[in-house]
UniProtKB/Swiss-Prot annotation:
Source organism, top-level taxon: Bacteria
The protein's name: Histidine ammonia-lyase
Modified residue annotations for 2,3-didehydroalanine (Ser): S146
Native organism taxonomy: Bacteria, Pseudomonadati, Pseudomonadota, Gammaproteobacteria, Vibrionales
Entry-linked Pfam families: Lyase_aromatic
Annotated Gene Ontology cellular component terms: cytoplasm
Keyword Lyase attributed: yes
Amino acid sequence: MDMLNLTLKPGCLSLNQLRQVSRSPINLSLDASAIPAIEESTQVVERVIAEDRTVYGINTGFGLLANTRIAPEDLETLQRSIVLSHAAGIGEFMADETVRLMMVLKINSLSRGYSGIRLNVIQMLIDLVNAQVYPCVPQKGSVGASGDLAPLAHMSTVLLGEGQARHNGKIISGLEALKIAGLEPITLAPKEGLALLNGTQASTAFALEGLFIAEDLFASATVCGAMSVEAALGSRRPFDPRIHRVRGHRSQMDSAMAYRHLLDTSSEIGQSHSNCEKVQDPYSLRCQPQVMGACLQQIRNSAEILLVESNSVSDNPLVFAEDDDIISGGNFHAEPVAMAADNLALAIAEIGSLSERRMALLIDSALSKLPPFLVDNGGVNSGFMIAQVTSAALASENKTLAHPASVDSLPTSANQEDHVSMATFAARRLREMGENTRGILAVEYLSAAQGLDFRAPHKSSPRIEQAKQMLREKVSFYDKDRYFAPDIEKANSLLKLAMHNVLMPEALLPSVL
């Protein structure tokens, strides 16, 4: 993938741009039209200080200490202290890709001109992104309100020459990170520490990654599902547009259309059993548009929410320069992100659950009319027997992980922050769930290709044959038992590259052009 050259117009990021940011390094610049609003909001903060007005986050403490007035000589110390004290996360570091996406989201939000932060602070974040210097940010420690305080604090420590960062896979000090980017440690002005820390950007970055994973899984599951229909000599009639039109769900209709797109009438396998006596297929084949359509709807709904959040201002307090006003609110509360992530979790789990059932059908000779466990000379050969057990284990694990996180809340900050979203965990677990579902799909991919080879000399449709050939370039037909795990890994690697997206109809998935 070519490096994205992105000129940021604050509040105008697209899902496709965000997908690219999450997948590869970028060259980022700020559109000049954003500068006046940034400078005007900074001037409002400067007037507050000059006029000795009391405003939360500028010259007061934070959280339960909001009523504590801070002396003018301590204001710079206040901003430095909030960054260092709030950098209290634990656990493994976020992936560089996640940190990059989080930083771009934070830059986008700050550049809207409602945060009272100076242009040179925003430019420092841009310079770090362009130098591919990514702060080391622990994954755990945020409850998604008041924003993602700990993760964003860890991000911000590097601006002070503190903390750690990663460059070319090597962990370095914050001071060394700045040197690589050609920067010096900064002294934060009033409001700037809080502006950097307040926001939903960590949760949203995790959730966006989950969205993009879910989209790729949807495409692969549709392709693998169509392959399984062919391998099991399933009927195409359940994909007839009339069935789905009378129900009326747009995503179900679109899902059925995707199966028709893959299973076109040129298939020799389809023609070979067009007059068979079988009346109905099991649900895992027949009800794919209904189940996958529901998953697609959750993906689309979540995409809409996350696109809005990605371009939002989730700081507090907010600076409205046109009114010379600063207002405390609660845009940092990540409930929309948490609920979107919970719905993505349901979709990812169901995509995997349905795939596992299709694979189980293929190895059952009574249902698929294929050799037991998809291998000749059964007994001597066990074939795909234990691969299905692996799929079942992964599907079961996802059922637990899919439990909604947004229904949980624990009060924090001495009950000042008495309801929180748990958005960070809601979104963070999507990667693990995606890996589980990708593993399930890898097993189905292998199984369906094996089943299709047993239907030779008949061939499937061109797109299904293309999908099978992608796999056969890496994994050969099973004529007898062999070491299985490497083949699952090869199939998994193909799925991780989102190779099946090109086989899908255009404009089906929100972030895929």
